[in-house]
Regions:
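Conserved alpha/beta enzyme-core scaffold
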Residues: 1-229
Length: 229
């Protein structure tokens, strides 16, 4: 990787993507929307074909999964979120079934190539370190294995430490975009969801350790545990 930081535009950065490449997108709130949009513009212009897109759950639009991009982008996701559920169920997009803890192994063992990793990071500190913030999961392995790493520098990305910290020398192109991170917003549980939450909460003992998923039912369960210890 280059040690020289390169600041550029999204349109210039995504020019490193070639037909047939495998592209990783960072997850959830860290989905790099400005890079995604720039990549899709290249697809619309007929500059790309057979590009494989990999990611876990992402928030926000997933324009590369639109059937109009058949033959241009192939979605091979590690998680089926609401923004790609319909196209996956229709058979247009593919899902790779795997445990979350093992997704990084796909890149490290070479089972899934990674030519370009498109990520979001916080601004670099005085030592040149940035943080992956809300998306470490498979993104760290993608950064380590990719031929090119394109990072959106966003002041709203939290500076998480530990394995989330990477040095800017690992990044080939920096793009500035301070768009607030996308939030997952849920409505209040309805009558059925509340009833399910009550039944589940009754089975949970005080002092229990919980692993919660995403969505209305986990939120309904948690809402019934406010007076528990």
């Amino acid at each position: 990787m280059n040690t020289q930081i390169k600041f550029t535009t999204p349109e210039e950065a995504v020019k490193v993507i070639k037909s047939g490449d495998h592209v990783h997108l960072s997850s959830v709130a860290s989905a790099p929307q400005c890079l995604i949009n720039a990549m899709c513009k290249r697809g619309e212009a007929g500059e790309l074909k057979d590009v494989h897109v990999h990611h876990l759950h992402t928030e926000g639009p997933a324009p590369y999964a639109d059937p109009k991009f058949e033959g241009v982008f192939q979605l091979d996701s590690f998680f089926v979120g609401s923004n790609v559920r319909k196209v996956t169920q229709s058979g247009y997009a593919d899902y790779i079934p795997i445990f979350l803890s093992e997704t990084q192994k796909l890149y490290r063992c070479g089972a899934v190539p990674c030519n370009v990793a498109m990520i979001q990071v916080c601004p670099p500190d005085k030592h040149g370190f940035v943080s992956l913030g809300t998306s470490v999961d498979a993104t760290l392995a993608a950064v380590e294995c990719a031929d090119y790493v394109i990072a959106v520098v966003n002041k709203y990305v939290p500076r998480a430490f530990g394995q989330a910290m990477i040095h800017s020398s690992k990044i080939d192109f920096f793009v500035q975009d301070d768009t607030p991170l996308i939030e997952a917003k849920f409505s209040e549980p309805n009558e059925v969801e509340t009833a399910i939450g009550k039944h589940c909460a009754a089975l949970i003992e005080d002092g229990a350790t919980l692993q919660m998923g995403i969505g209305a039912i986990p939120n309904a369960v948690l809402s019934q545990l406010s007076n528990r210890v």
